[in-house]
Amino acid sequence: MRNRKFFFIVFEGIEGSGKSYQSRKLYTAIKKIGLSVILTREPGGTKGAEKIREVILKDYFHLDSKEKFDKYTDTLLYLAARNEHIQNKIKPAISKKKIVICDRFIDSTFAYQVYGKGVNKNFVNLVHKYILGNIKPDMTFILKVNISKALQRLKKRVTKKNRYDKFSKNFYIKAQKAFIKIAKKNKKKYYIFDNSENYKNLEKSIFKLVRSKLIK
């Protein structure tokens, strides 16, 4: 089966929402039906962007240190990683008519940096104007989760935690509300799923919906 066009799918949600798991499962399912698909993530996805990711996520400052990344420094790092990702991963995928599944994209910046940390929305929009061009996701899945359950999942993670796994419960509540608010503004391209349902059932529901868009 041959891809007819570039198709861009994004998974969004707070830490512990299951978005990384579902993005991997969708990638495998699409690959099985013979379509050309890549799985990527933000921040990251390319060699340069992964280096920036290390700077963003590593806790460089001791807990008792007064020195922290300013919220605009933090945001600019994310946007720099995004530009690298778009130039070196997304744009080549467009030219090759690939399906791209991305674990996080622009809505995470708005939910975390704008709504969560108070970064000026116009500042982010201005930078996006230059780095995004006409690139927009065709489908975005927002995975809604019970915050307490998400925090429990984070505690059980065997991988090394980063500073974004250590925010307060109130911050995650605020971020999740932001994701849902964003999704409700464009119901044609956003799909909100409650991740409290069975993982396998959710996996099947997402694939069925994506398949209906890819194969017409």
Predicted regions and their residues:
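ATP-dependent small-molecule kinase phosphotransfer cores
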Residues: 35-132
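Conserved beta-strand scaffold positions in the cores of enzyme catalytic domains, especially
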Residues: 37-39, 140-142, 190-192
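Hydrophobic anchor at the beta1->P-loop junction of P-loop NTPases
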Residues: 9-11
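Hydrophobic positions on the alpha1 helix immediately C-terminal to the Walker A/P-loop
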Residues: 22
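NTP-dependent small-molecule kinase module
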Residues: 2-3, 27, 148-216
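Walker A (P-loop) phosphate-binding loop of P-loop NTPases
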Residues: 16
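Conserved lysine of the Walker
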Residues: 19
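A glycine- and Lys/Arg-enriched "phosphate-lid" helix/loop adjacent to the NTP-binding pocket
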Residues: 104, 109-177
